[in-house]
Swiss-Prot record:
Keywords: Cell projection, Ciliopathy, Cilium biogenesis/degradation, Cytoplasm, Cytoskeleton, Disease variant, DNA damage, Dwarfism, Leucine-rich repeat, Mitochondrion, Phosphoprotein, Repeat. The modification Phosphoserine is found at residues 136, 177. It is linked to Retinal dystrophy with or without macular staphyloma: An ocular disorder characterized by decreased vision which worsen over time, and dystrophic changes in the retina, such as retinal pigment epithelium mottling and vessel narrowing. Macular staphyloma, without high myopia, is present in some patients. InterPro entries: Leu-rich_rpt (IPR001611), LRR_dom_sf (IPR032675), U2A'_phosphoprotein32A_C (IPR003603). Residues 129-156, 168-212 are annotated as: Disordered. It comes from Homo sapiens. Residues 97-137 form the LRRCT domain. This is Cilia- and flagella-associated protein 410. Plays a role in cilia formation and/or maintenance. Plays a role in the regulation of cell morphology and cytoskeletal organization. Involved in DNA damage repair. LRR repeats lie at residues 19-40, 41-62, 63-84. The gene is CFAP410.
Length: 256
């Protein structure tokens, strides 16, 4: 759903976009917030629990001081590039987005290295010690994320999986940090990655293939948390079609 001029003016009780200072669009099923580019006076905006996948529209809100984006679909921390030019930004809530990955520490350090003026991140005060550590432990973001297309809709699955795919390629098991650092959040959402005991013992010959397959499965299960009912239905249909195709191949093999 696109955030429209009418929606903004109604919620902000304003007559013109350029005069809007505070806006609350919590849980509005939004995917497109491009109209934010027309709100230069915006200071506080709440966009939590939506389906927003890019931060580019708020890059022109030079007076923005508080940005709430919990539980959206921001795919990569590279999106933080669009916030680097906001001199007044002091409060950011970005938790429960795909970009947070499986390492809370790495995520927090990267955000603080990119946005050192923050005073509060994900409802936790930022300390001087954290800012110092972020210089060496956080990743440096120097360019805007590459995009396939110009829309502001949902991200491609390959982009959302980028960090987890990297872990799979390097042999790093996302189950390690996910089970230890974010089990509480997963309990709340009613979903956990598969435990090691759920996978059967395999020979050394199959170990590498099994490890990669487990990482892919874990990534998929983690991403399911971010989908709404419509998205889950699409996944269900795709899985059903895939299962039907595989069963057809098995029948053909047996016939031969």
């Amino acid at each position: 759903m696109k955030l429209t001029r009418k929606m903004v003016l109604t919620r902000a009780k304003a007559s013109e976009l350029h005069s809007v200072r505070k806006l609350n669009c919590w849980g509005s099923r939004l995917t497109d917030i491009s109209i934010c580019q027309e709100m230069p006076s915006l200071e506080v905006i709440t966009l939590s629990v939506n389906s927003i996948s890019t931060l580019e529209p708020v890059s022109r809100c030079q007076r923005l001081s508080e940005l709430y984006l919990r539980r959206n679909r921001i795919p990569s921390l590279a999106e933080l590039f669009y916030l680097k030019g906001l001199p007044r930004l002091r409060v950011l809530w970005l938790a429960e987005n795909p970009c947070c990955g499986t390492s809370p520490h790495r995520y927090r350090m990267t955000v603080l290295r990119t946005l050192p003026r923050l005073q509060k991140l994900d409802n936790q005060a930022v300390t001087e010690e954290e800012l110092s550590r972020a210089l060496s432990e956080g990743e440096e973001i120097t360019a805007a994320p590459e995009r396939e297309g110009t829309g502001h809709g949902g991200p491609k699955l390959c982009c959302t999986l980028s960090s987890l795919s990297s872990a799979a390629e390097t042999g790093r098991d996302p189950l390690d940090s996910e089970e230890e650092a974010t089990s509480g959040a997963q309990d709340e959402r009613g979903l956990k990655p598969p435990s090691r005991g759920q996978f059967p013992s395999l020979s050394a010959r199959d170990a590498s293939s099994s490890h990669r397959g487990r990482n892919v499965l874990t990534a998929i299960l983690l991403l399911l948390r971010e989908l709404d009912a419509e998205g889950l239905e699409a996944v269900q249909q795709t899985v059903g079609s895939r299962l039907q195709a595989l069963r057809g191949e098995e029948v053909q093999e047996h016939a031969e």
